[in-house]
Every structure is written in C-alpha cells, then in structure tokens.
C-alpha cells in the first residue's frame, strides 16, 4: 500500500507540474482551470499535533500547491525539524488530494487525500497518511468555520504500526477588526507506541490549541497567531516535557 500510494503521489505531482509548465508556455493558468498558491511562515515552535518537532526552537516553513477547477490538487510543504539526534533536520512533505462541495443545504466541503511525511536525511522515518476533512462555514456566527478531520496510517513514523488521528478545529472572526479566535482539539492513537517517557505505555494522547489571530489589512495574505498549544502526555524529563506541555507559540504567516 505504501509503495503504491507513494508512486501515486509522485505521478500526480508530476502530471500537475507538467500541465503547469505547458500552460505557462501557451497561456495563463486560469485558462487551463489551474491556480497556484503558496505560503511562508516563521514560528517560535513547530508543534505537530501538540508535540514539538524542533526541540521547542523556531522553525521556518513554507509550501506551494497547484489546484485544478475539478477539485484535484497537489503540492509540497516543508519545515526544519530537530528530533534531538543528528538527523533529520528537514521535513519535506508532498501531498495530493481532491476537494469538493457536497450538495447539501449547509454546503459542507469534503477534502480527501494522501500526505507523505518525508525526511531526506533520515528516510527510515518516512511515512504516508490518508486524510479526510469535512468543513462547515457560518456554523455559529457569520464568517466562522468548523473543520473535522480523520487521519490514518499503517506506517506511523516508519514503524509499520497503525495510527489514527481525529481533530476538530473552530475559527471565528471578531467582527471587522481583523482579529479572530481559533480553538482545536485532537486525539492520537498509535498501536505499540509509548508517547510517555516513563514507561507508562501511553499509546494515545489528546492535544489542544486555543489562540488569537490577526489579519493585517494593509498587507494582503499576512497574518499572525498567538496560541497556547499542549498535550496531556505524561512526561518527566526535559527537553521532552517542555515540548509536549502547554506553551505559547507565535506564528507569522504570509500566503500568496
């Protein structure tokens, strides 16, 4: 399954980028139903599902995606990482998916795809994950959104073990101020994996985030977020304890 899915991702990205090159040579992207997007971010701590991926140090992140009007998309996202060992220092994740609006009154948006966690200098950590997301807008207040996600892999962190991740994220704008709020809660369950550092054999944990966002009106696409991020992982030793307990994370993000 892993090899097949990886080939599918590679072929999909190649196909989309090839189309992009042809379109650039002959006409604009929009005439081919294609659109390009990207982002760059600087964060004080790369927290993945509540757990630091940089030993609580800052991270520079970014990515790009090509989307087609049919709903198909493919892209790559990257960040520096530090797991406390010599390698890896870079995470580079290709992904491919399909998003569509469902024909219901609330017009929820379904997004399904494959995400490959790649570590070029430590390929033993590489693993593939399947995801499905369902998004709703104007749930409680005008302009808000609720996103529910389910993720599954049979090769968690390259260990050939099953793992599930469930998450719900809610965002809401504060009137027309540019400020907003964000809150999320997630649950991870991994077979034969101990997230504690004291032999508690905790194969599951809960993560959370509560924060405030700000969109800079004078600079389109520029936003900032200050959030409290943490988990209920039972940890005693540093620096692992610091990297899983609740802490403040500031992120500056620019989309284009």
Task: Indicate residue ranges for each PLM-predicted region.
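Short loop/turn motifs that connect adjacent beta-strands in outer-membrane beta-barrel proteins
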Residues: 23-35, 71, 86, 101-109, ...
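Detector for outer-membrane/organellar transmembrane beta-barrel domains
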Residues: 127-203
């Amino acid at each position: 399954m892993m090899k097949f899915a990886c080939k599918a991702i590679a072929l999909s990205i190649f196909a989309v980028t090839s189309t992009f090159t042809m379109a650039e040579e002959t006409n604009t992207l929009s005439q081919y139903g294609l659109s390009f997007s990207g982002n760059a971010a600087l964060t004080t701590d790369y927290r993945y599902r509540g757990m630091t991926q940089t030993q609580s140090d800052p991270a520079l992140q970014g990515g790009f995606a090509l989307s087609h009007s049919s709903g198909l998309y493919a892209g790559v996202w990257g960040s520096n990482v530090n797991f406390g060992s010599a390698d890896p220092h870079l995470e580079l994740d290709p992904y491919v998916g399909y998003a569509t609006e469902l024909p219901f009154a609330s017009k929820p948006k379904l997004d399904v795809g494959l995400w490959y966690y790649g570590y070029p200098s430590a390929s033993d950590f590489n693993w593939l994950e399947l995801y499905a997301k369902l998004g709703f807008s104007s749930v409680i207040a005008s302009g808000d959104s609720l996103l529910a996600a389910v993720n599954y892999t049979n090769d968690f962190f390259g260990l050939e073990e099953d793992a599930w991740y469930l998450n719900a994220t809610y965002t809401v704008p504060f009137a027309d101020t540019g400020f907003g709020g964000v809150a999320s809660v997630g649950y991870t369950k991994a077979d034969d994996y101990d997230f504690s550092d004291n032999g508690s054999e905790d194969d599951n944990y809960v993560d959370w985030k509560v924060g405030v966002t700000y969109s800079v009106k004078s600079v389109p696409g520029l936003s900032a977020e200050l959030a409290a991020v943490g988990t209920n992982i039972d940890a005693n030793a540093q620096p692992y304890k610091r990297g899983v307990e609740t802490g403040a994370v500031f992120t500056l993000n620019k989309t284009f």
